């Protein structure tokens, strides 16, 4: 089948693997419309449809025969381990460690063979499947626990009636998300198949329980995803982080290199925006992602989102930027790691955060560049929080007063610094190796480290105390300081893809 894609790959300047992947994502749109036309009272047909489409992706389209057998092995091991050990406390941990260990093994193989990110192989689908299988194991365990011991999420997602093998295969191979996500929980999949998710008061399609508005939102996501893809195809080939390690880049002035890094970072992100937005749209067409109705009765479909590009490109601060990236992975880390490693009756602490971060790092891959990016992320979140706590109160308007020019300027500078730091710290994530990552940072003059570490140094050698005393002298109320600082971040809003922030481990002197 490669012969069909070679001319197109040559025309757009992409690899054959990339073209085949995008083709699978686009094929999912008409197939999503077919899926919803299978009667919901015939769930077996819907499960078989999911399985059949995924087999079509893996075999004739992508040629991932060995890779699929590995995925199938993980699926069957998870299913039977959960089925015959559902009441064992060890079961979810066994599945978690086995599935994550298998993924890490394949990540190492990818490093050994030096496969580029353009090569489509098993680790991409396996990362999604890892989230689904490990979440399922915990959901089954929650279904055997006393409901009084469960929180709201655990109670809603718990699996109390163990599924048939066909149902589980349909879930694991749910076709819109089988290659690159989005991930979803088993209860959500079953509710989708039986159309239990949808309730009045909105309009419905063709007498079915499926709310109207699904196609409008889904195809809008497709257009948006294709637009991002177009940007990447046109500009990404010559504007990416790999240019930073070329002799030409070293010959440019420092200011030009910094400006080019902003362009490279933006272009690199567009491919993720494209893929995740395309899969979100296809998922919506099957009915996944429904989040209710507006007061006017219009349906909303935000539950399948994995990224919010506008928030990332125009962030109010670094935290909201992180919260809007790879959102499904953050939910998985929170529900399947962070909450689970904390003993009952105790509050999560430093080690809970560190082990959750380590899981995130292992899940992403074995390349050194990933770890450089993630480790730096912990310092960035700390510096950003301290800046917000110490600087923001000076710019907040009095209660009941309109936003001032100074506050708008503060927000603009904060967004600009967030993007500058993001495009700096993300470069190792794409350059991958230690040598290339250090070369890239060196040619940028280590400006991200200067900004972040310089800020932390300021706050830790007396800057925090100075700002607090100045706030008191200016009569800034404690209420305004609390408003600027924010309350302790709820578990549901924590970011788990970076290590614990320094200020949470060793607070600066005040």
State each model region's role.
Residues 1-510:
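Non-catalytic, membrane-anchoring transmembrane segments at the edges
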């Amino acid at each position: 089948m490669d012969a069909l894609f070679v001319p197109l790959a040559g025309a757009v300047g992409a690899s054959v693997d990339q073209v085949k992947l995008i083709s699978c994502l686009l094929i999912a749109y008409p197939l999503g419309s077919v899926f919803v036309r299978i009667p919901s009272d015939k769930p077996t047909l819907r499960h078989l449809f999911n399985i059949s489409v995924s087999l079509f992706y893996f075999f004739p389209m992508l040629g991932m025969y060995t890779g699929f057998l590995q995925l199938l092995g993980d699926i069957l091991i998870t299913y039977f381990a959960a089925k015959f050990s559902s009441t064992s406390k060890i079961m979810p941990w066994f599945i978690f460690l086995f599935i994550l260990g298998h993924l890490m093994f394949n990540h190492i193989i990818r490093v050994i063979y030096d496969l580029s990110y353009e090569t489509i192989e098993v680790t991409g689908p396996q990362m999604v499947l890892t989230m689904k299988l490990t979440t399922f194991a915990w959901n089954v365990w929650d279904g055997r626990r006393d409901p009084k011991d469960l929180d709201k999420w655990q109670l809603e997602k718990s699996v109390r009636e163990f599924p048939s093998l066909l149902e589980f295969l349909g879930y694991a191979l749910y076709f819109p998300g089988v290659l690159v996500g989005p991930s979803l929980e088993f209860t959500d999949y079953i509710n989708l198949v039986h159309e239990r998710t949808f309730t009045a008061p909105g309009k419905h399609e063709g007498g079915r329980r499926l709310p109207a508005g699904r196609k409008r939102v889904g195809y809008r996501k497709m257009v948006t995803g294709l637009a991002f893809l177009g940007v990447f195809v046109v500009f990404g080939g010559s504007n990416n982080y790999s240019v930073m390690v070329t002799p030409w880049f070293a010959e440019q002035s420092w200011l030009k290199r910094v400006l080019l890094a902003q362009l490279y970072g933006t272009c690199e992100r567009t491919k993720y925006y494209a893929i995740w937005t395309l899969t979100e749209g296809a998922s919506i067409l099957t009915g996944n992602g429904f989040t209710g109705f507006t007061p006017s009765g219009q349906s909303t479909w935000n539950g399948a989102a994995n990224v919010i590009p506008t928030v990332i490109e125009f962030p109010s601060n670094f935290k909201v930027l992180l919260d809007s990236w790879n959102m499904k992975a953050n939910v998985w880390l929170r529900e399947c790691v962070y909450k689970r490693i904390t003993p009952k009756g105790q509050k999560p602490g430093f080690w809970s955060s560190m082990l959750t971060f380590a899981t995130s790092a292992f899940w992403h891959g074995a390349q050194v560049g990933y770890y450089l990016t993630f480790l730096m992320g912990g310092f960035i979140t700390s510096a950003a929080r301290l800046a917000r706590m110490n600087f923001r109160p000076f710019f907040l308007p009095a209660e009941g007063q309109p936003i001032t020019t100074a506050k708008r300027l503060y927000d603009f500078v904060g967004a600009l610094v967030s993007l500058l730091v993001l495009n700096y710290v993300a470069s190792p994530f794409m350059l991958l190796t230690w040598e290339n990552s250090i070369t890239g940072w060196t040619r940028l003059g280590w400006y991200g480290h200067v900004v972040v570490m310089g800020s932390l140094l300021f706050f830790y050698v007396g800057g925090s105390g100075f700002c607090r005393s100045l706030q008191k002298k200016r009569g800034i109320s404690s209420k305004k300081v609390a408003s600027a600082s924010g309350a302790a971040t709820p578990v549901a809003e924590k970011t788990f893809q970076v290590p614990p922030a320094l200020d949470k481990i060793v607070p600066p002197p005040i």
